[in-house]
Amino acid sequence: MNKIDFDYDQIVIGSGFGGSVSALRLSEKGYKVLILEKGLRREDKDFPTTNLDTKNYLWRPELGFRGTMQFTFTSKTTILHGVGVGGGSQIYANVHLIPPDAVFESEAWTKIRKDWKETLKPFYGLAQRMLGTANNTYTNIADDTLKEVASEIGYADSFKTVNTGVFFSQAAGQEGQLAKDPYFNGDGPDRNSCIYCGACMLGCRNNAKNTLMKNYLYFSERNGVEIRPSSEVVKITPLNEDGRAGYEVIVKETLGKQVRQYSLQSRGVVLSAGVMGTVPMLLKMRDQHKTLPNISSLLGQEVRT
């Protein structure tokens, strides 16, 4: 086979938690990396101020809605997931919980390996450091009401504040103030502390939420990773039978009213478009395009999101 002139060493599909971590760690190893994201790239000021601003809140591009929140409906569930550079980190509730033992001990996990808890333990610490995990001590009348209800039904001990990925002020009266990077010894972006506005799931306009643009993607771009928004992958084809020779990726780019389709070649591909992006894409490649026929028939089973 002739030597292939690859466009990239690795193409990462999706810019959420999985894609951003993959891109950063690959770039640290010296690989040339491209992130493809079907949604838009936003500055903090571009997030909507209300979910009634449907064009900037919801993702329904066929209706002209190019927001951050996509709804996927199945026969049993309604799933909300993030779209845009930063993925779900833009609009999730910031809560950082380590699963209880019952999760690690469930059959879906233990039939693969028995030591998940110990295996993952050091990586939870690393993720917490990168995402700026801190305990949210703020409570209001809604929290007080929940605490009272829990007490009335005999579950008072279950009430607690949670760890979140938000930059909180270190002293009362300093909410919203600008501070030099508080997480990476001054090597990361400057931040403003939380003003407790409650707009976390609309998108933080105040530079306080520790979205992936403030950490993993920030350092990825500094390492030379390229991020292409408005770029949706429509086909993945291995260049030989098992993909060892690399892959061709067909991309549909939508910028404004302009649409173009082009192909890229890379040594490897990382699919990290979230459960509702990655699983349907793999099913499509296996069953419709038949470019990835060796994907397991178990794809889509035992899924957690």
Indicate where each model-derived feature is located.
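N-terminal glycine-rich phosphate/pyrophosphate-binding loop and immediately adjacent elements
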Residues: 1-118, 277, 292-305
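Short, well-ordered loop/turn elements at secondary-structure boundaries
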Residues: 6-7, 28-30, 78-79, 84-86, ...
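A glycine-rich dinucleotide-binding beta-alpha-beta segment and adjacent secondary-structure elements
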Residues: 7, 66, 197-200, 234-237
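Short, glycine/acidic-rich beta->alpha junctions
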Residues: 15-18, 142, 208-212, 262, ...
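Short alpha-helical segments and helix-capping/turn motifs at coil-helix boundaries
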Residues: 17-21, 75-78, 142-148, 213-214, ...
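Glycine-rich loop(s) and the adjacent beta-strand/alpha-helix scaffold that form part
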Residues: 28, 39-49, 206, 222, ...
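Conserved redox-cofactor binding core of oxidoreductases
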Residues: 113-230
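Short, hydrophobic/aromatic-rich segments at coil-to-beta transitions
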Residues: 244-250
